[in-house]
Amino acid sequence: MSAEHSSDIAETIRRIGQQARAAGRALARSGTGARNDALAAIAARIEAGSEAIAAANAADLEAAREAGLDPALIDRMELTPGRIQAMADGLREIAALPDPVGAVRELASRPSGIQVGRMRMPIGVIGIIYESRPNVTADAAGLCIKSGNATILRGGSEAIRSNRAIAEQIRAGLEDAGLPGDGVQVVGTTDRDAVGALIQMPESVDVIVPRGGKGLVERIAREARVPVIKHLDGVCHVYIDEAADTEKAVAIAVNAKTQRLGTCNTMETLLVAEAAAERVLPEVGRQLRDAGIEVRGCERTRALIDEAVPATEEDWTTEYLGPTLAVRVVAGFDDAVAHIERYSSGHTEAIVTESYPLAQRFLREVDSSSVMVNASTRFADGQEYGLGAEIGISTDKLHARGPVGLEGLTTEKWIVLGDGHVRS
């Protein structure tokens, strides 16, 4: 690739960034009503433009099949009439959510007489890099608009036509509501250099949110000069304590693994206290077998689940995203927590127990973005948490942690109210 070509891409991304920065200022100043009007207008535009979106998507699907892409990826790319309608409905749902922008908390009087508090404000410009799912274009744009942020979207090259078609409707809807169309921009090139330029532009982009495979996220985390909201893996654990109710334990373990296999909040390792193993594991093993799940277990697990195969050290760190589960029998609570500390990716962990003291210890001692008691890890989701929608999940400790909804797309500034006060 020529230096001239790379320079052209960098200049294009720089121009997009400048336009986003200017639009972001206008969005931040806009009122809740204007942003909600924009979301409603975009939803209407997507419905009215559904045939154009479907045609663009059909071209992407044809190219993907000709290129021999994985059928599962092609399925994620497809925009059926129902999925297109779901994009519009999702935007209306976002419009109905409470607006975090401008909310003031902890306003209190100080001994000097001033009042000090914190006001929630948009972050500014959010870059979102994602793969295969073109519906993310509308979902992510909607969350950013509602929270008063401009956004730059860089979708997967395999869905470039679909993303452009959706972006046209988003721009038109923003302008219908009197807001700048540059508030949402899609990077129009499929060149990988565009990603490199976007993540190294702190003067125009305030944060990057990568949504995709581990390789993509690792590259962005390694190369970015802009803060990144991310998670790499979802190695989630369920620990069945000796004080667990057997019926609850079996139901939670089976649901956490089988309700949906390919998600980041699916359980990948099951830990069982040795005092509970004989009454829990045979039934768990039977139901997992019926669901087509391969169990990779320690020696004590294999003694209780006939179909289990030996687990290796690698299994304890693997996010399978498929019909495989690692199972280990542990001495008890402390052993389980030690295993989680060593192998967890920091996403979601759950304990099944009827012991209130142990449940409280688990909540305090396990340092993951979501920690649960007597509930399936599959609940680690913005919709289930009452956020309405999420831009992604973060396993970092700064700035947002866990499911990132509207509030996670804002920041706080200090506000001070006085009446002629001067400092003595």
From Swiss-Prot:
UniProt KW keywords: Amino-acid biosynthesis, Cytoplasm, NADP, Oxidoreductase, Proline biosynthesis
Main localization category: cytoplasm
UniProt record, GO biological process: L-proline biosynthetic process
Keyword Amino-acid biosynthesis tagged: yes
Claim: Plastid is one of the keywords in the record: no
Annotated transmembrane regions: none
InterPro entries: Ald_DH/histidinol_DH, Ald_DH_C, Ald_DH_N, Aldehyde_DH_dom, G-glutamylP_reductase_CS, Glu-5-SA_DH, GPR_dom
Name of the protein in question: Gamma-glutamyl phosphate reductase
GO terms of molecular function: glutamate-5-semialdehyde dehydrogenase activity; NADP binding
Pathway: Amino-acid biosynthesis; L-proline biosynthesis; L-glutamate 5-semialdehyde from L-glutamate: step 2/2
Localization of this protein: Cytoplasm
Domain of life of the source: Bacteria
Documented EC number(s): 1.2.1.41
Function: Catalyzes the NADPH-dependent reduction of L-glutamate 5-phosphate into L-glutamate 5-semialdehyde and phosphate. The product spontaneously undergoes cyclization to form 1-pyrroline-5-carboxylate.
One cellular-component annotation, GO: cytoplasm
Family of this protein: Belongs to the gamma-glutamyl phosphate reductase family.
Catalytic activity: L-glutamate 5-semialdehyde + phosphate + NADP(+) = L-glutamyl 5-phosphate + NADPH + H(+)
